[in-house]
Amino acid sequence: MLMEKYHDFEPNFNIVEIFESLQGEGFNTGMPSVFVRFGKCNLDCPWCDTPYNNFKRWSVSQILEKVRSFSSKNIIITGGEPTIVPKIEYLLEQFKSDGYFLAIETNGLKAIPAQIDYIATSPKSLYAHKYEKRCIPFANEVRIVMDSNMPSFCELIEQKIKAKNYYLSPCEIDGKMNLLETITLLGQLNQRSNKPKWQLSLQTHKLIGIE
């Protein structure tokens, strides 16, 4: 249906980069994957280290050619924020036709395309008011970057987004990683009764110097 809809007009996409590497964080750490990074985002987090506004227009054919040049059959759709990309379902259908396993990295505020096999969401505490109103109800994993107002935000996300795995990740503030604060909060969260257990997720790709 989607292929027929766009038969006479193949959409182009804002692509920051496409590369093959190892997943560096979360449940699938170490998994060889092809990363397709889309431009633009619907949030503006002050600590974001992703150049999501530095993109070029790629055709579907160009994207497929690049992705097929790598050996991995796992694709991570990331950004920016991929759920705001117009006509992304068309591209995802092409990936599925090629037999790829599709994971998405999203902030969790917009609906997830049906073609996605695995959802990793990273809710942002700066926008807690948005998650109180509406967000995705389920993810395979939740990864939250440790910044401020975290205990109450973690509890909010537990209520809003059901997940198999919940992770906290430290972030760099004024040139220093807040690892101590992160593991301290992990201990507090995991002392609660009948609540989800949280785990530590590090950006291991940065620690070992890969993309």
From Swiss-Prot:
Keywords: 4Fe-4S, Iron, Iron-sulfur, Lyase, Magnesium, Metal-binding, Queuosine biosynthesis, S-adenosyl-L-methionine. Coiled coil: none annotated. It catalyses: 6-carboxy-5,6,7,8-tetrahydropterin + H(+) = 7-carboxy-7-deazaguanine + NH4(+). It is an enzyme of class 4 (lyase). Binds 1 [4Fe-4S] cluster. The cluster is coordinated with 3 cysteines and an exchangeable S-adenosyl-L-methionine. Catalyzes the complex heterocyclic radical-mediated conversion of 6-carboxy-5,6,7,8-tetrahydropterin (CPH4) to 7-carboxy-7-deazaguanine (CDG), a step common to the biosynthetic pathways of all 7-deazapurine-containing compounds. PANTHER family: 7-CARBOXY-7-DEAZAGUANINE SYNTHASE (PTHR42836:SF1). Belongs to the radical SAM superfamily. 7-carboxy-7-deazaguanine synthase family. This is 7-carboxy-7-deazaguanine synthase. It comes from Haemophilus influenzae (strain ATCC 51907 / DSM 11121 / KW20 / Rd). The lineage of its organism: Bacteria, Pseudomonadati, Pseudomonadota, Gammaproteobacteria, Pasteurellales.
